[in-house]
Amino acid sequence: MATAQVIAFDESIKFMESIGIENIMQHEADLVEYGQELLQKNNSVKLIGSPKNKGGVLSFTLEGVHPHDIATILDEDGVAIRAGHHCCQILHDKLNIPASARASVGIYNTKDDLDKLNYSINNCKKIFNLKWI
C-alpha cells in the first residue's frame, strides 16, 4: 500500500482547502495577466492562446529560437519551463509552429518569478543576437 503517498495527498488537499480554491484560481489568474503584460512588451515573443479564461499557463514562442533552446537557457538561469508539443501536436501543426515553450504558474509563484522569466527570455535574445526591444 502507498501509505506515504496517501498521507501526502491528504496534506495537499488540506493545504489547498486552507487557502481556498477561489483564492488559488485568482492568484494564478493575476500572475498570468501580469506575465502576459510583461511578455507582450517583448517584440520577439509570440503568446499563444486567448488571454481570457486561461489556466495558470503562459505558452509562447520566441522568434528565431527553438523552444528547446529557450528551455535550456532559462534552465541555466534557474527558470523552469517546458518545451515541445505538450501532448497537443495537432494544435501545433494547425498553428504552424514546430513546438512551443510553456511556463506554468501556481500558488507557490510570485510576480518576481515572472520578472525572472522575462529577464531570462531577454537573455535568450542576447545569446541569439535577436533585435532588442
Regions found by a protein language model. Give the residues of each.
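Pyridoxal 5′-phosphate
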Residues: M1-I133
